[in-house]
Curated annotation (Swiss-Prot):
The keyword Cell membrane is assigned to this record: no
Compartment(s) where it occurs, according to its Swiss-Prot or TrEMBL record: Membrane; Cytoplasm
PANTHER family found in the cross-reference section: EXPRESSED PROTEIN, PLECKSTRIN HOMOLOGY DOMAIN-CONTAINING FAMILY B MEMBER 1
All copies of domain PH, residue ranges: 21-128
Keyword line: Cytoplasm, Developmental protein, Membrane
A GO cellular-component term linked to this record: membrane
Descriptive protein name: Pleckstrin homology domain-containing family B member 1
Stored CDD domains: PH_evt
Subunit comment: Homodimer. Interacts (via PH domain) with MYO1C. Interacts (via PH domain) with MYO7A. Binds transducins.
GO biological process, one term: regulation of cell differentiation
Tissues showing expression: Highly expressed in retina and brain. Levels are very low or not detectable in all other tissues tested.
Length: 243
């Protein structure tokens, strides 16, 4: 009797996370850093120690990705989160505040207290556990939206070359977009995993390295150049008052 032929996998069961090093995924509420509004995103914790959040569970349109590995100072949940209010209709027991070593902070909210505790455990483990060799992680992507069409640009987590990025906050989409430098827009610039820095009326351009390298020096030079430009413009605006 010949052995039975193997049954092909059902295409309906295929997942976008197949053969990818996904540690944990699920829906969480995220508070934006500028307007302090709550938005529901699909979060994916990858085995390389990064936490990405997306528009839906297909993980095709990534809004941003945060470095967790060796970058978490502490995580507070529930009543420990004193300086944040939960989304409307949600319990305070589901709150999570992730304090990063680089100065950033994530305010999240899970559906239940148990879900919040499970996320805290997974994040702390990702913070202290090195990624195994050969782990496959999807490339990082950003959506660049123009007035005519939308395209997606992707890059690998760690490459040697340096790139210049300008990140503009979109109040309509409630996240940062990577766009070419535009002198007619107020551009908000931040370090890749750090808090935003705003310079009203001045376009800031910095040299951003990949996460494997420090971006402190280019960021400092960019902020210094922006401050000097702002001071020069201010002196020109007040110069008519001297005559």
């Amino acid at each position: 009797m010949s052995p039975a032929a193997p049954v092909p996998p059902d295409s309906a069961l295929e997942s976008p996370f197949e053969e990818m090093a996904l540690v944990r995924g699920g829906w969480l509420w995220r508070q934006s850093s500028i307007l302090r509004r709550w938005k529901r995103n699909w979060f994916a914790l990858w085995l390389d120690g990064t936490l990405g959040y997306y528009h839906d569970e297909t993980a095709q349109d990534e809004e941003d990705r945060v470095l967790i590995h060796f970058n978490v100072r502490d995580i507070k949940i529930g009543p420990e989160c004193h300086d944040v209010q939960p989304p409307e209709g949600r319990s305070r027991d589901g709150l999570l505040t992730v304090n990063l070593r680089e100065g950033g902070r994530l305010h999240l909210c899970a559906e239940t207290k148990d879900d919040a505790l499970a996320w805290k455990t997974a994040l702390l483990e990702a913070n202290s556990t090195p990624a195994p060799a050969g782990a496959t992680v999807p490339p990082r992507s950003r959506r660049v939206c123009s007035k005519v069409r939308c395209v997606t640009r992707s890059w690998s987590p760690c490459k040697v070359e340096r790139r210049i990025w300008v990140r503009v906050y979109s109040p309509y989409q409630d996240y940062y977009e990577v766009v070419p430098p535009n002198a007619h827009e107020a551009t908000y610039v931040r370090s890749y995993y750090g808090p935003p820095y705003a310079g009203p009326g001045v376009t800031h351009v910095i040299v951003r390295e990949d996460p494997c390298y420090s971006a402190g020096a280019p960021l400092a030079m960019g902020m210094l150049a922006g401050a000097a430009t702002g001071a020069a413009l201010g002196s020109l605006m007040w110069s008519p008052c001297w005559f």
